[in-house]
Amino acid sequence: MKITGRNIKRRLYGLRTLPSKLKRARYFRGHGVHSPFVYSIVREVFMRSELNTERRELYDALMKINVAKRRAIQLQNLMEHCKYATFKIDCEPQQIKDCDMVIASIDIPAEELATLADKAREEQTTLCIMSPSLDHQRDKACQAIVEAHPCTSVDNHGYLLLFNNYLPKQKFRL
């Protein structure tokens, strides 16, 4: 007689990934992040679900290009937290000058991301790449950019932040 229904293997299937999910949740809250700058970003930006200030320019621009509301709120809060005044979305590498933050949406092909990252590094501008693991080609391009990046990078699965300032080379995957 064959036993049907949910056996013990099927009941415990979800527990296999539990340690990695708990680890990611801890990093999301800031545990294990030993950089004061990144820790403050985790606490003041990633863990907020509402806008911190009345400024909404970046939020409105991101909502127009169909970025998720949560990601738009986080990036607007990041702009306020880092005291950035100007931003550009999907600009050419030559247009990065005089800009604090550049956002590369999913409309930018993976082949052009490295050029954009190099120009952002030259101009000391923070680069935000939306959906870094959208497909295999974009994921590989973003991994290569992070490996070559001389400063701090933060990947929170929704976007990849490449800071080009005084911070040491650190890679965070939250």
List the predicted regions and their residue ranges.
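A short alpha-helical cap/connector motif
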Residues: 1-123, 133-174
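Short beta-strand/loop segment that forms part of the nucleotide-sugar
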Residues: 127-130
